[in-house]
Regions:
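N-terminal strand-loop-strand beta-hairpin
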Residues: 1-120, 155-186
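A contiguous pocket-lining binding segment that forms or flanks enzyme active sites
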Residues: 124-129
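Long, well-ordered alpha-helical scaffolding segments within enzyme catalytic domains
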Residues: 144-155
């Protein structure tokens, strides 16, 4: 079981040009979903400062996952992730609330997923920021290969987590928000 996430992002992409390139290189289009997420920190919010959290994610009507994430470094493989499938989004939120870990923030994003040569390519659209693409795979070499196939320059790859990027590149204090959704950002 691989618990290290190997991923990078390319920010402020031309979505239509990227989709065209994905089709040209034969990437498999796995569709677009709205992702609903409940982000959970410890009651003292130490986890937030330590860049770790629990996430309950509902992917449209397809699946629900519970994930523990810990960002140790801002590198291609600097994230530890442990994820499992669960059945009930709302019941999971209630369970954590009952044990003293209520959800802190509700996130939403739209994700258009593709697969190419074993690499997952996610075109992510969040509220308030430009759309970006995330590549995730088994190795840095695999990501570099797919980035090259998609005409993405590796020197432009960003290895920060989404929260860091939203706060530091776009000056949106998302870690203080209770809602970061398409209907409400506060």
């Amino acid at each position: 079981m691989n618990t290290k996430e190997i991923e990078c992002r390319f920010l402020e992409i031309d979505v239509e040009a990227l989709k065209k390139r994905l089709a040209e290189v034969g990437a498999k289009d796995e569709g677009e979903l709205l992702l609903d997420e409940a982000i959970i920190y410890d009651p003292e919010l130490k986890w937030r400062d330590e860049e770790r959290f629990l996430r309950i994610r509902k992917s449209g009507d397809k699946s629900t996952t519970l994930t523990y994430k810990e960002h140790s470094t801002h590198t291609v493989d600097g994230t530890y992730e442990l994820e499992l499938n669960i059945d009930y989004f709302e019941k999971a939120k209630l369970l954590f609330e009952k044990i003293g870990l209520p959800f802190f923030r509700h996130n939403q994003k739209r994700r258009h997923k593709f697969k190419l040569d074993g690499v997952t390519i996610d075109i992510d659209t969040w509220p308030m920021i430009p759309t970006y693409v995330e590549l995730e795979g088994e190795s840095e070499e695999a990501l570099k290969k797919v980035a090259e196939m998609l005409d993405l320059d590796w020197k432009d790859a960003d290895f920060h987590n989404a929260r860091w990027m939203i706060e530091n590149k776009y000056n949106i204090p998302v870690s203080t928000f209770r809602h970061f959704t398409f209907e409400k950002c506060e």
